[in-house]
């Protein structure tokens, strides 16, 4: 079974903030495949189902971003899911808005949610889908920016971006990380795969 975990913060005030892109991608997958992500388990909302013939658990940790590992580690242990079948989806301020980068391993690169996950699992060999949120202009406070509502000017692109990310996650489960990286890693919207 795959555990597809979107990182974010619980609460309506954060629902459409850049920091909740991981939740939005999980919601999109849930909608596409008829999976209800409503069951509480290990400090997360989860839903079990199938994507392209693969058993999956969709999860949205409810611990707040910086404690995400506190939810995912017990969830994985309880359901005996291999770490190689964990995919973590989250926002990345180091990447421009609309960019997507799948990585099979690596550091948290300053992302506190991913840092928590790595600390709890004691390994950085965790597949992750990083979703670029940098607006392309200087920002005063990264912490304020990631928690503020997504700008109206970006809302039109948000639907496409979330759909693109959901397709990337789906491809990881169906075809593996390497193929997904080749197909989906991109610097910004509009670039073809060869340029990304």
Swiss-Prot record:
<feature type="site" description="Stabilizes the basic form of H active site to accept a proton">
    <location>
        <position position="91"/>
    </location>
</feature>
<feature type="site" description="Discriminates between blocked and unblocked aminoacyl-tRNA">
    <location>
        <position position="9"/>
    </location>
</feature>
<dbReference type="Pfam" id="PF01195">
    <property type="entry name" value="Pept_tRNA_hydro"/>
</dbReference>
<dbReference type="InterPro" id="IPR036416">
    <property type="entry name" value="Pept_tRNA_hydro_sf"/>
</dbReference>
<dbReference type="GO" id="GO:0006515">
    <property type="term" value="P:protein quality control for misfolded or incompletely synthesized proteins"/>
</dbReference>
<comment type="similarity">
    <text>Belongs to the PTH family.</text>
</comment>
<feature type="active site" description="Proton acceptor">
    <location>
        <position position="19"/>
    </location>
</feature>
<protein>
    <recommendedName>
        <fullName>Peptidyl-tRNA hydrolase</fullName>
        <ecNumber>3.1.1.29</ecNumber>
    </recommendedName>
</protein>
<dbReference type="GO" id="GO:0072344">
    <property type="term" value="P:rescue of stalled ribosome"/>
</dbReference>
<dbReference type="InterPro" id="IPR018171">
    <property type="entry name" value="Pept_tRNA_hydro_CS"/>
</dbReference>
<comment type="function">
    <text>Hydrolyzes ribosome-free peptidyl-tRNAs (with 1 or more amino acids incorporated), which drop off the ribosome during protein synthesis, or as a result of ribosome stalling.</text>
</comment>
<comment type="function">
    <text>Catalyzes the release of premature peptidyl moieties from peptidyl-tRNA molecules trapped in stalled 50S ribosomal subunits, and thus maintains levels of free tRNAs and 50S ribosomes.</text>
</comment>
<dbReference type="GO" id="GO:0000049">
    <property type="term" value="F:tRNA binding"/>
</dbReference>
<feature type="binding site">
    <location>
        <position position="66"/>
    </location>
    <ligand>
        <name>tRNA</name>
    </ligand>
</feature>
<dbReference type="InterPro" id="IPR001328">
    <property type="entry name" value="Pept_tRNA_hydro"/>
</dbReference>
<keyword id="KW-0378">Hydrolase</keyword>
<dbReference type="GO" id="GO:0005737">
    <property type="term" value="C:cytoplasm"/>
</dbReference>
<keyword id="KW-0820">tRNA-binding</keyword>
<dbReference type="GO" id="GO:0004045">
    <property type="term" value="F:peptidyl-tRNA hydrolase activity"/>
</dbReference>
<feature type="binding site">
    <location>
        <position position="112"/>
    </location>
    <ligand>
        <name>tRNA</name>
    </ligand>
</feature>
<feature type="binding site">
    <location>
        <position position="14"/>
    </location>
    <ligand>
        <name>tRNA</name>
    </ligand>
</feature>
<keyword id="KW-0963">Cytoplasm</keyword>
<feature type="binding site">
    <location>
        <position position="64"/>
    </location>
    <ligand>
        <name>tRNA</name>
    </ligand>
</feature>
<keyword id="KW-0694">RNA-binding</keyword>
<comment type="subunit">
    <text>Monomer.</text>
</comment>
């Amino acid at each position: 079974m795959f555990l597809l975990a979107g990182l974010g913060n619980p609460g309506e005030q954060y629902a459409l903030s850049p920091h909740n892109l991981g939740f939005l991608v999980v919601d999109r997958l849930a909608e596409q495949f008829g999976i209800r992500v409503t069951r509480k388990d290990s400090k997360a909302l989860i839903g079990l189902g199938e994507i392209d013939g693969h058993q999956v658990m969709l999860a949205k940790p409810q611990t707040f971003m910086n404690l995400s590992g506190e939810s995912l580690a017990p969830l994985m242990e309880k359901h005996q899911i291999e770490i190689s079948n964990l995919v973590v989806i989250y926002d990345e301020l180091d990447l421009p808005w609309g960019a997507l980068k799948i990585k099979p391993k690596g550091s948290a690169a300053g992302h506190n949610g991913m840092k928590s996950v790595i600390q709890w699992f004691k390994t950085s060999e965790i597949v992750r889908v990083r979703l670029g949120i940098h607006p392309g202009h200087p920002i005063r406070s990264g912490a304020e920016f990631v928690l503020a509502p997504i700008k109206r000017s970006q809302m039109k692109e948000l639907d496409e971006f979330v759909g693109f990310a959901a397709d990337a996650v789906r491809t990881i489960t169906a075809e593996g990380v390497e193929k997904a990286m080749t197909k989906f890693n991109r610097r910004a919207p509009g670039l073809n795969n060869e340029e990304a």
